[in-house]
């Protein structure tokens, strides 16, 4: 079974999110869409504009098959912690991850990922 995961907040859900669902369905029509969404608090500890139930219902209504809640400790952490937790959770059962980006240039994204994973950047 194909499963596409999305790490999200939907604060609020908008037409860009709907377009993401449409693009997933277009590229992989048989894939289930699972959203891992922050709860009533979003990144940086801000309260969400709408409660988590309403935001989850909007996602389901617009095409998501399942909405799960990102643990609050992950939602309230740094952007890196938010993303890393989401990838760790969804990576356990999703075949694909879908995300929006400021650039459509995949080469820029891949070079950035390589840099972030390099020994020069990580001092682990």
Q: Where are the regions a protein language model picked out?
A:
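Nucleotidyltransferase catalytic core that binds NTPs
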Residues: 1-124
């Amino acid at each position: 079974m194909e499963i596409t995961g999305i790490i999200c907040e939907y604060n609020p859900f908008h037409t860009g999110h709907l377009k993401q669902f449409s693009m997933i369905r277009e590229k992989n029509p048989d894939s289930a869409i699972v959203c891992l969404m922050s709860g009533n608090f979003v990144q940086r500890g801000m309260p969400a504009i709408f409660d988590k139930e309403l935001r989850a219902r909007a996602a389901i209504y617009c095409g998501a098959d399942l909405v799960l809640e990102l643990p609050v400790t992950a939602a309230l952490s740094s952007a890196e912690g938010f993303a890393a937790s989401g990838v760790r959770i969804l990576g356990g059962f999703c075949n694909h991850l879908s995300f929006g980006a400021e650039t459509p240039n995949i080469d820029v994204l891949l070079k950035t990922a390589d840099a972030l994973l390099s020994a020069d950047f990580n001092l682990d």
